[in-house]
Amino acid sequence: MDRGMHFTRDLTATRSGLLALLFLTSLTILSNPARAQEAARPPDDSDHIIFIIDTSGSMFKHAWPMVLKKVEETLNLYPQVQGFQVMNDEGVYMFVDDRGKWMPDTPEQRHTVIERLRTWNLFSNSSPIEGIVEAIRTYHDTDSKISLYVFGDEFTGPSIDPVVKSVDAINRDAATGGRRVRINALGFPIRSDAPQYTSTQFATLMRTLCQHNGGTFVSLDERDAR
């Protein structure tokens, strides 16, 4: 399917303005000026955001400049939130003393996060379930509108279905039946000469989780790094 047609279909299927945030990349590679204007829309109405970033070797060695770019672009599209947080896919916090807290949204804090991210190379099993569960269990709040942004390139877990069922259960508010947080994801390309199975698994998993939890999955390719 044509990339532009696929993006348009996703745009009409999601809440107005969400794809303006998720993630500028799918807009910047399109030359259509009308599409570019979508990037100027306000993002969704979340007042707190959490980045869950795969810090595995494949990401750090192959995709890290793109990761830095996309984190900055996402932050820039939120002029002001009440707080944000960063952890890796295993639920390890960028700043361990901040577990259970929100980092204040200030220019200085944003700069600190980006600078720390440049060298943030932790061991990772390339499975976002731990980070997603940690984020939901620790931060869900009925008075807050929270969006998760999962960045990754592979899913190495044995099966997708148990992960989807676990997240569906954890992310459901018992009182209202609604979702506690919105889950969005960005899939990064792996080397063309590497096995593609785990990358396909990540895309399948995150597309399903995003569909179930009010968000959007966007898959990048090498052109998006430019």
Segments the model singles out, each with a brief description of its role:
Residues 42-101, 104-145, 147-151, 157-158, 187-200, ...:
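Von Willebrand factor
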Residues 37-43, 178, 224-226:
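Pro/Ala/Gly-rich low-complexity, hydrophilic intrinsically disordered segments
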